[in-house]
Each structure stands twice: as C-alpha cells, then as structure tokens.
From Swiss-Prot:
It comes from the Bacteria. PANTHER family: S-ADENOSYLMETHIONINE:TRNA RIBOSYLTRANSFERASE-ISOMERASE (PTHR30307:SF0). GO terms for biological process: queuosine biosynthetic process; tRNA wobble guanine modification. It holds the Pfam family Queuosine_synth. One of its GO terms (molecular function) is S-adenosylmethionine:tRNA ribosyltransferase-isomerase activity. This is S-adenosylmethionine:tRNA ribosyltransferase-isomerase. Its main location: cytoplasm. Its EC number is 2.4.99.17. It comes from Thermotoga petrophila (strain ATCC BAA-488 / DSM 13995 / JCM 10881 / RKU-1).
Amino acid sequence: MKVSEFDYELPSELIAQEPVEPRDASRLMVLHRKTQRIEHRIFREIIEYLEPGDLLVLNVSKVIPARLYARKKTGASIEILLIERLEEGIWKCLVRPGQKVKKGTELVIDEDLSAVCLGRGEDGTRILKFQPQDDRLIFEKGRTPLPPYIKNEVPLERYQTVYAKEEGSVAAPTAGLHFTPELIEKLKKKGVQFAEVVLHVGIGTFRPVKVEEVEKHKMHEEFYQVTKETIKKLRETRERGNRIVAVGTTTVRTLETIARLPEQEEYVGKTDLFIYPPFEFKLVDALITNFHLPRSTLLMLVAAFAGKDFVMEAYREAVKRRYRFFSFGDAMLIL
C-alpha cells in the first residue's frame, strides 16, 4: 500500500494555532461505520452517543516541558528536545542543528544548568547528561514542546489533558484535550465508566513516514502501562456487552498491543505496534480522535479502524466545512 494514498489537500489556515475555549466547544464530526453516515456536532454533545456501561479509556500520560534552548562554548545556539529519560538527569534527546553536537560537546542552558553529550543514540538522537542531574530543575527550565506547525506560544497546562498525571510524553495525546472536568462528571452521572492507561508519546510523533510503501515503515518503541484495575474494567465491559471507547490513537495502540499478548493481570513494556489497513481490532469498539497530518501513521490507524475510503471522504468533507486540524483542532468520533 502506498503512503501517497493517505495524502490530502489541507489549506494552511485550517491548522489550528490555539485551542478553543472552553475545551468542549470544539466541533465533533461523527462517523457511523455501519451506515457510512457523517454527522456534524459540538464535542460536549458526545454524551448523546455514549451509553451507561460504556467504558471510556483515557491515556493519562502528562506532557513534560521538553524543549530547552542552549549555547555551545562557541556561542552557537542549540535547541534540545527531551525524548526519553534513561536515568535521573540523563536523557535521550533530539538536538538542532545535530551536526554541531558531538560526543563531549558541552551545552550551557543557563548559569544553573548545563549538559554534556555522552554520544549518539539511534535515529539521530543524542544522549545528554545534565549538570546537576536533577529532572525537576531540567523541567523548570524547559518549555512546552509544541509541534512545529503551531507558531504561537501556548502555556503547558493548555497542551495538557485535564486528567494527565504520569509524566513522560513529549507531545500531548490530543484527543483528550476536548474533555473538561464538568463533561467528565456529566458522563459519569449518565453511567459511563472510565479507565486509564499510560502511553508516553515519544520520538515517533516527530518523525514523518519516509518510505513509499506503508508496510516498510518502522514505528519507534514507546513505553506503556495497563494496571490490574483497568484490565478488570475491560473484562467487565466485555461481559456486560458494552463498548470499549478509546480516547485517542495512543490508547488504541496500547489496548491493541495487550490484546496480542498472553493474558496477564497487568502489563508494562514498550510497544512499536503499527496499525494500518487492513487490521483486526480485538479490543477497541469506538474511537475519539483528532484530524491528523497527511501521510501520517495516525491517519493510517484511523483509516484501519473506519475504512480508508470513508475516512478520506470524511477528511475532504472536513476541509470543505472548515474544520480545524491537528493538535488544537476539532475532534472525530467513530462508531
């Protein structure tokens, strides 16, 4: 399958530069897979599509302030993006411009914090040892790691879901950005159940698909965790005959990863599961997601879930109706 089959025309003004206020006022496109029908709603109206006993599964990973600005002793500016914590104060990072950072290169963030490059990691990353080796201090100096297509500065808390709690992501699981505490409360009152997973969004988010054929793309591993409590809720939902509704593609990848492993009480590990058409979904019955970049692995996952032709038609419709796209954009519910 060609990556070009997942391309579409997107006018740049439809790339959302800031989030909607309140969060649940964003638009919601509803895709009905059985009837191939499309509806246009507001996100807070999602409550009408969820039944008592349905299970909403949230990724509670929290975005870290992963972007740092440093200088070499020569005065050259270097941008650092924290990717993965290896141990306290030692991080796998992306650095720009990369050719200027070699083993032994010293980087000064400010008078309180510096770093030295210990060497190269895979896929162009660098291993940086910070001085002092204090993650709290590193985070104090860091800024929101917004994607490159967002030109505005946005405070970190607004690039965070209201339920985020496990630090580790370098990009937000954006489908969850539309939920407010009030909407969650209303859903609970209706009898909708909630469960949590963790998947720390990593370097894969920043890496475009560079191959021509979908099958040749390799996903980067990302850390995930599913607790005993969540496993119990998933099992009970299945037994009741209710739906498991994944909030975001990261939740889908976590659930479909554990669905392919031997049964356990709880799961923790790394996943490089790449979901593209055709794919047999074993746990996820419905999906809440945003509108994704052309040719991206996220769009391929959505196409695998709802059917490629239907999804590409929905995206053309979204462009025509001036939906807002990407991280701070509008949402889609696939039933």
